Amino acid sequence: MAVANPTTEQAILSEVRKQNRDRRALRFWLGFVLLALFCLVLVGGATRLTNSGLSITEWRPIHGVIPPLSAAEWEEEFRLYQRIPEFQQLNNSMTVDEFKGIFWWEWAHRLIARGIGVIFALPLLYFWLTGRIEKRLRWPLVGILALGGLQGFIGWWMVSSGLSVRTDVSQYRLATHLVMACLIFAGCMWIMRGLSPHSNDPAPARSSRGFAATIAIFALFQIYLGALVAGLDAGFSYNTWPLMDGALIPSDLLIQQPFWINAFENPKTVQFIHRIGAYTLFALTLINMVIALRAAPWTTHARRAVVLFSLVTLQAAIGIATLLMQVPLHWGLLHQAGALVVFGFAIANWRGFYGEYPHATAIAERG
């Protein structure tokens, strides 16, 4: 029988302890990034709900950090806004002081986005150079950084859609912008969850991992639909529940031609699909919870299933309240915040079925 080498065991234990310290630091960093992303999405939602997204008509990644500081600079910024259709057709009586109200939302949104780039890139460089990032995670983290850079271009691409002909931004580009933000959020959540300790509880069923993936992906699809609702102001189409102006299925869902375009450009149809999506997500998480509680009660997987169903139920209630109150700003933002919480937890739940990233040992490193 082989006798363990105390020196080798000590080296392995030392390596694991060091890796655990590094993982705690990475989790703290990614958690802070997730919090910043959450704030960014909320400010972006407020920018949309207050119709502030077109208040800054130029893309100046570096110079744009500094807002107007004098009356003359404010007049110049306002003059640029006066050139676009939104001002000419909708806001032609707006004053400079009123313009400042919408300007600050868009400026804050862009400033936070730039700040997130810094708080992601600089720690990433530091952790990389000091050898604290495991090899398996280096390029995925670089990929998230690249998505962040791409998101900046997508944001301007979205804004530019409302500067020449339209009086608002394209709902397609708005949805793309929000989905990309969610993908960046999901990437950070996935890695942070993989760096966290996991229980050894068995999965409730063979299909649990696939079902968790389905829920997470469908939650993202529901967010995409929500972005279309916001982009088309579809939240004002039907402000009754559970019926839609007295009908389960309204008669004016397919009034545009070709018929399929209604799913993207008819506000009433988009709201209807978003409602159906909410019912579907509710059903998926209910089934998931029932399976988990029956097959593996008292496990961490069952507890996650209960929490996920509870979050979706709460989000549905917030959505209904927002609808009935005709989308007041604070309720609209609460609904958007709830969507990101549901999606983030769905990603963490999905990642939970894969277990913690394996620890590298001193022997493996030498090999």
UniProtKB/Swiss-Prot annotation:
Substrates-to-products reaction catalysed: Fe(II)-heme o + 2 A + H2O = Fe(II)-heme a + 2 AH2
Listed cofactors: heme b
Enzyme Commission code: 1.17.99.9
Keywords, sorted A to Z: Cell membrane, Heme biosynthesis, Iron, Membrane, Metal-binding, Oxidoreductase, Transmembrane, Transmembrane helix
Subcellular location: Cell membrane
Pathway connected to this protein: Porphyrin-containing compound metabolism; heme A biosynthesis; heme A from heme O: step 1/1
Transmembrane segments: 25-45, 111-131, 139-159, 174-194, 210-230, 276-296, 305-325, 327-347
One GO-annotated biological process of the protein: heme A biosynthetic process
Membrane topology: Multi-pass membrane protein
Molecular function (Gene Ontology), one example: metal ion binding
Subunit composition and interactions: Interacts with CtaB.
Family as reported in the entry's similarity comment: Belongs to the COX15/CtaA family. Type 2 subfamily.
Protein name, as recorded: Heme A synthase
Species of provenance: Rhizobium leguminosarum bv. trifolii (strain WSM2304)
Lineage of the species this protein comes from: Bacteria, Pseudomonadati, Pseudomonadota, Alphaproteobacteria, Hyphomicrobiales
